[in-house]
């Protein structure tokens, strides 16, 4: 029995990055031997065991053979005769196909170290094209390591393009796709994930609503970058630079989908894109079964982001309607995330990344003014039921009007 540290732990140590999760592969052992040593089986599809003390995952060396469509269409074979090299060749990228023994000696049969030095994301073997999920994984790694100068090797991008055209991407489950998408959006440069998917044709298959934004112009006076797709990528980058949560990043990605439906004769204006984009946002949300908080925020940001930008011009009644749409008195955090998404949208414009966004504090102030209205005096005046709700609305409206007068430009 020989035990090796494999994959990301080896890669990140060589890159000088923090190592969080460690995966181990066991060569020359059977499942019975692992059980005899106190390891606990957890793998449903192939032999994976938890270490009796550390709880880390140990997998028996295995080979795999394509036997059906999609991510799960594989037959696995694990036995003591499977070599380390045979186990490593089934992995996606050369930089993930290195192993270290217990003395720290490196095994690198597919030149992963060379590709690390050359900053290349390169597939290990032609079998890469058998697993459509790898298109998303490579794009995610590109987003993670873009800051270190990594790029996808041309021949790997070509394989990804073939996979995108094969129909295999449609076999991916919503859950597997969302897991990769959500992880990619939380990387330091999530816009690279979208760009790589576009470069290989996968974006047009998985998220055609976003792909359709590229080449659609916006008014240069508001958007010096002009292209709606380029703007979306910039907004996503700003969300990452400002360390926004997943829900905000997802909303930033989807906020302008309606612009892809604007007839060409109306370009570069996009009147009503907030409303026309809602069905598209719903479709993308449902396609990937995004978490409820991500779905809700994406729809609200899509519908109301222009309100956010025009906050200082809105009537008091419109401001109150906006606050009520977000259920701000019970869910203040969601309104904060809306403000954040609006600010990222404003900053995602060429040359305007550092421009102040006074709308943010103005919206917070309006919400706070309305929140300070007390219910108890209205109860003491005898209001109840629907009359109480209307009286409370009028008092909040009065408070917002006073706030507007105090903060008039």
Swiss-Prot record:
Single GO molecular function: phosphatase activity
SUPFAM superfamilies reported for this sequence: Nucleotidyltransferase (SSF81301), Poly A polymerase C-terminal region-like (SSF81891)
InterPro entries on file: CCA_bact, HD/PDEase_dom, HD_domain, NT_sf, PolA_pol_head_dom, PolyA_RNA-bd, tRNA_CCA-adding_enzyme
Catalytic activity: a tRNA precursor + 2 CTP + ATP = a tRNA with a 3' CCA end + 3 diphosphate; a tRNA with a 3' CCA end + 2 CTP + ATP = a tRNA with a 3' CCACCA end + 3 diphosphate
A UniProt-annotated Pfam family: PolyA_pol
Details of cofactor binding: Magnesium is required for nucleotidyltransferase activity.
Domain HD, first and last residues per copy: 228-329
Binding site for ATP: 8, 11, 91, 137, 140
Its EC number(s): 2.7.7.72, 3.1.3.-, 3.1.4.-
An annotated GO BP: tRNA 3'-terminal CCA addition
Positions with a binding annotation for CTP: 8, 11, 91, 137, 140
Required co-factors: Mg(2+); Ni(2+)
Keyword DNA-binding: no
Record NCBIfam families: PRK10885.1
Function: Catalyzes the addition and repair of the essential 3'-terminal CCA sequence in tRNAs without using a nucleic acid template. Adds these three nucleotides in the order of C, C, and A to the tRNA nucleotide-73, using CTP and ATP as substrates and producing inorganic pyrophosphate. tRNA 3'-terminal CCA addition is required both for tRNA processing and repair. Also involved in tRNA surveillance by mediating tandem CCA addition to generate a CCACCA at the 3' terminus of unstable tRNAs. While stable tRNAs receive only 3'-terminal CCA, unstable tRNAs are marked with CCACCA and rapidly degraded.
Anything else known: A single active site specifically recognizes both ATP and CTP and is responsible for their addition.
Domain comment, as recorded: Comprises two domains: an N-terminal domain containing the nucleotidyltransferase activity and a C-terminal HD domain associated with both phosphodiesterase and phosphatase activities.
Name by which UniProt lists this protein: Multifunctional CCA protein
Lineage: Bacteria, Pseudomonadati, Pseudomonadota, Gammaproteobacteria, Pseudomonadales
Encoding gene (name): cca
